[in-house]
Amino acid sequence: MDEERSSMLPTMAAGPNSILFAINIDNKDLNGQSKFAPTVSDLLKESTQNVTLLKESTQGVSSVFREITASSAISILIKPEQETDPLPVVSRNVSADAKCKKERKKKKQVTNIISFDDEEDEQNSGDMFKKTPGAGESSEDNSDHSSVNIMSAFESPFGPNSNGSQSSNSWKIDSLSLNREFGYQKLDVKSIDDEDVDENEDDVYGNSSGRKHRGHSESPEKNGAHSVTQAGVQWHDLSSLQPLPPGFK
């Protein structure tokens, strides 16, 4: 009974060493402290085991240091290469070329827009000229017609049968054609009054020229000059009239 109680005591005791007393294993190293004193062989074994453990630990630490130094050396070598790398210069040139291309595209687009606007303005102006009501002719045609009529009015007094009555009639016909056929604005009242005065004076000059032909024979050159003065009376004011010859009464 005492042996059984003594075997039960280690199980109730606290601490890991108490369990080793109750368990008996074939391996002596695991049985814990033996009752006998340790021999020299046991001490040598333990020392060799400790040495091997130290070697393994030192090898592991050395391998770790080697890996760290290798990684740090690689990082140090990579950094200066990146600083001296010519790639950033190439990227700047490429960016400058891209900017130049963008500016050229913008300039081209602006010119195209201006050309389109000009075409639209020309089309609109053409439509406006087509839509404007009138006599069916452009301003250039009307100006041509008016210039032809005025030249005919100038040329009529210098014809072979140039008299004051004929020139006045031609002026009336031209004025009617300008006022009725081509739809121009009518002449002012002042110009009409001046024309009436000119016609009366032309009649007076015509009668006087008839008397001169009866009394005195004059050359055709003088008649031509007289008709020129009559044409000048039609187109100019009374102040531009030539004085009468001294033989006229």
Curated annotation (Swiss-Prot):
Stretch forming the signal peptide: none
Start-end of Polar residues biased regions: 226-242
Region entry Disordered, spans: 109-171, 188-249
Superkingdom as given in the UniProt entry: Eukaryota
Biased composition regions of type Low complexity, renumbered to the chain: 156-170
Segments of skewed composition (Acidic residues): 193-204
Family: Belongs to the sorting nexin family.
Protein name listed in UniProt: Putative protein SNX29P2
Annotated organism of origin: Homo sapiens (Human)
